[in-house]
UniProtKB/Swiss-Prot annotation:
Residues 1-32 form the signal peptide. It comes from Mycobacterium tuberculosis (strain ATCC 25618 / H37Rv). Keywords: Signal. The lineage of its organism: Bacteria, Bacillati, Actinomycetota, Actinomycetes, Mycobacteriales. Pfam families: DUF4189. Induction: A member of the dormancy regulon. Induced in response to reduced oxygen tension (hypoxia), low levels of nitric oxide (NO) and carbon monoxide (CO). It is hoped that this regulon will give insight into the latent, or dormant phase of infection. This is Uncharacterized protein Rv1813c.
Length: 143
């Protein structure tokens, strides 16, 4: 009985030592990957043993007075979302009218485009129409 207890204790200590040894070996590798920017969020969270934090995506909708439009969603930064929306719009007079993380929409009243945002498509559409004080929805996007 004492022999089994000693054997289990020895195995537990060996397992703990091996885990610590692997941790010491992995830390320089993780630091090197982080310095190069090549470590993915998934790999980092697996190593840390923590849940993966939600990734925030950004979106934007751009319009020109001519009616030309462009939209972007699932972008990693607000600046990239605006850039993609403006590129897709393709008109020099395009302006971003809605910037969002969840949903965005654009309302038009015949003379002006107005953006809105919300947690859902419906909320974003309502926000755009309310900000314009009327009009109709002409575009929307959600991440």
């Amino acid at each position: 009985m004492i022999t089994n207890l000693r054997r289990r204790t020895a195995m537990a200590a060996a397992g703990l030592g091996a885990a610590l040894g692997l941790g010491i070996l992995l830390v320089p590798t993780v630091d090197a990957h982080l310095a190069n920017g090549s470590m993915s969020e998934v790999m980092m969270s697996e190593i840390a043993g923590l849940p993966i934090p939600p990734i925030i995506h950004y979106g934007a909708i751009a319009y020109a007075p001519s009616g030309a439009s462009g939209k972007a969603w699932h972008q990693r930064t607000p600046a990239r979302a605006e850039q993609v929306a403006l590129e897709k719009c393709g008109d020099k007079t395009c302006k971003v009218v809605s910037r969002f993380t969840r949903c965005g929409a654009v309302a038009y009243n015949g003379s002006k485009y107005q953006g809105g945002t919300g947690l859902t498509r419906r909320a974003a559409e309502d926000d755009a129409v309310n900000r314009l004080e009327g009009g109709r929805i002409v575009n929307w996007a959600c991440n």
